[in-house]
Amino acid sequence: FRRVENVGPKVSAELLQSGIIAISLSLTAMLFYIWVRFEWQFSIGSIIALFHDVIITLGIFSVLSLEINLSIIAAVLTIVGYSMNDTVVIYDRIRENLNKFTKLNISEIANISINETLSRTIITSATTLLALLSIFILGGEILKGFSFAMILGVIVGTYSSIFVASPFLKYLKVNSKTMCRSEEK
C-alpha cells in the first residue's frame, strides 16, 4: 500500500465527508437490522444509543481539541458495531423475558434482562479495554488516536446499551401484549 504522510485540506475534507457518509450508512443499516430482527421500538432505542455513542466520542475529541482523522472515523465505525452488539444481547434477553414474564412491566423486564446479561457485558468490555489500553500504551504514536477513541467508545457504548437503549423501550410503551401481537403476524 502506498503511504501518504500529508493530506491537503481539500482531500482531507473529502475524506471526512466520506467518513460521515460511512457512519450514516452504518447507522441506517443497523436501524434496518434491528427493525427486522426485533421491532421498530427496539430499532429506535438502538439508534438513539448509537447516536449517543458517536456524539459523546466525537464530542470528547472536540472538547480536548484532538484531531479527527480517518483512523478516528474507523474507530467510530467500529464503536457503532461494538455498541450494537452489546445492545442486541440485552434486547434479545428482553424479548425472551417479555414472553416469559407476561405480568411484569417493561421496566421490570429490562431490569431483569440487564442483570442477567450484566456479567457478560462487563467481562467483554473489560477484556476489550485491556487490549485497547495495551495498544494505547505500547502501540506507538500512530495508534494512540484510534485506541483512545476505541477506549472512549467501549466505555460509552457499554453505558448506552444498559442505560440508554433499554430504558428507552419504556417510553415507546413496549410490553408483552404488543410484542406477542406483532409476533403472531
Please annotate each region the language model reported.
Residues 1-185:
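A structural signal for conserved, well-ordered secondary-structure elements
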